[in-house]
Regions:
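Short beta-strand/turn micro-motifs at beta-sheet edges
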Residues: 110-115
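A generic structural motif
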Residues: 9, 127-135
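Short, well-ordered turn and helix-capping elements at secondary-structure junctions
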Residues: 9, 103-108
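Residues forming anionic-ligand binding surfaces in small-molecule and nucleic-acid pockets
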Residues: 2-11
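Acidic-enriched catalytic cores of C-N bond-cleaving enzymes acting on peptides and small amides
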Residues: 1, 14-104, 116, 132-148
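Short, hydrophobic beta-strand segments
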Residues: 5, 121-128
Length: 148
């Protein structure tokens, strides 16, 4: 899905309007940041309503699947994994729903600097759904968070 935040009717010079006019990029960044809490749990209202938790037995079976965390980190050249607290990386990538920002843009992006307050900001967001989640229902969920 694509999110668009609109502000003034045109790009504005920040030296003249900065501090008095809302910046759509700042608003969009706050909206995106609010989609996850400190435990990387998705905060979109209703997002987890139909997600079935695995039983302890199912999680134990999943833990038997071949997955080497150190090799995973080395292959990606990362120092640590991140994700929803309480789940392994194998679980996070295989059985848990996700919400990710795939792109964000707005304002001046050319060479050099231009002190502009943009009139619009955009983001592309994807969600991985799991069984029982409905794409129709979930598609309206981010709007609930955004409109809060």
């Amino acid at each position: 899905m694509e999110v668009e935040v609109t502000g003034p009717n045109r790009d504005l010079h920040s030296g003249v309007y900065g501090g008095a006019v809302a910046n759509p990029i700042n608003i969009l960044c706050k909206m995106i940041a609010s989609c996850h809490d400190e435990n990387n749990h998705i905060t979109v209202p209703g997002f987890y309503d139909k997600v079935q938790e695995l039983s302890a037995e199912e999680r134990a079976e999943m833990a038997k699947a071949p997955f080497n965390l150190e090799e995973y980190k080395k292959d990606l050249d990362i120092n640590e994994e991140r994700g929803e607290k309480g789940y392994s990386s194998n679980e996070r990538t295989g059985i848990r729903p996700t919400l990710d920002v795939n792109g964000i843009w707005g304002g001046y992006t050319g060479e050099g600097a231009k002190t502009v307050l943009p009139s619009k900001a955009f983001a592309k967001i994807s969600m991985r759904l799991v069984p029982n989640q409905s794409s129709k229902e979930i598609q309206s969920s981010p709007n609930k968070l955004i409109n809060q």
